[in-house]
Amino acid sequence: MEINGVEIEDTYAEAFPIKIARVLITAATKRWAQVAATEATGFATSVIMCPAEAGIEKFASPSETPDGRPGVYVQICTFKYEALEEQLLERIGQCVLTAPTTAVFNGLPDAEKQFNIGFKLKFFGDGMESEAQVAGRKVYKVPIMEGDFVTEENIGAIAGIAGGNFFIFGDSQMSALTAAEAAVDAIEELEGTIAPFPGGIVASGSKSGANKYKFLKATANEKFCPSIKDKVENTEVPADVNAIYEIVINGLDEASIKAAMKAGIEAAVTVPGIKKISAGNYGGKLGKYQFKLHELF
């Protein structure tokens, strides 16, 4: 299969189950909502060594938020609900409560699983906190130096999916990077997914385990490393490819990840110098979900 003259390999992305909480952060301005969201989703690229995977899902206009202010939806992902609750408390408590003019609302109010994060955060008020209603939602008002920090009582979570992905093969580092940026821009327009790596892009895609250093959980995916393509048996790097970037996508459900992969690939192949699109899979060792590239189209 080809799209815009670029080969789409007949392969699949292998993904795995993960627990996902969705949080809406609002602020007086879009800038401060984004600052708080960026801080709250830091050090969260991969569960290989981070305590969570997290990222900005989408921006929300004032007409879409409970308090009528600009907002940002973020997703925070861990393997277990217990760890997810800890991450929510720490990230909201340290990165959102501390940020100017912010408020926190439940991004999954209909989810069966609910964490009473707001109830726990209210204790920062040391007895001076109060209950209120915002657009029919129960919130706590915590007095702080600038005024009141408003947080909804609960934050919802569901069983989602992590590790949807595709690889972008370019004839140069800049062509591949430009295509990866275009892919991330397209994905950011959609609802239900995040791309948790820096700027949404993975420069150092890994394989599960190691050939030599068995103490590592993940190591360089040497079959996709252009600088050593002449040294690696069964390299996956074509002769005319000199850089590869991976886009990793987490999402609330399979449909959201498929839509994000499709949009990202369609954007990437419009960039001159892109030679091929592939995906990462590990023979079923990583997860139970398979997103076949050809079936996206």
Swiss-Prot record:
Family annotation (SUPFAM superfamilies): Formylmethanofuran:tetrahydromethanopterin formyltransferase
Pfam families to which the protein is assigned, alphabetical: FTR, FTR_C
Entry's Gene Ontology BP terms: methanogenesis, from carbon dioxide; one-carbon metabolic process
EC number: 2.3.1.101
Presence of keyword Cytoplasm: yes
Pathway per the UniProt entry: One-carbon metabolism; methanogenesis from CO(2); 5,10-methenyl-5,6,7,8-tetrahydromethanopterin from CO(2): step 2/3
Keywords: Acyltransferase, Cytoplasm, Methanogenesis, One-carbon metabolism, Transferase
Tagged with keyword Cytoplasm: yes
GO CC annotations, alphabetized: cytoplasm
Subunit structure: Homotetramer.
Family: Belongs to the FTR family.
Biological role: Catalyzes the reversible transfer of a formyl group from formylmethanofuran (formyl-MFR) to tetrahydromethanopterin (H(4)MPT) to produce 5-formyl tetrahydromethanopterin (5-formyl-H(4)MPT) and methanofuran (MFR).
Designated name of the protein: Formylmethanofuran--tetrahydromethanopterin formyltransferase
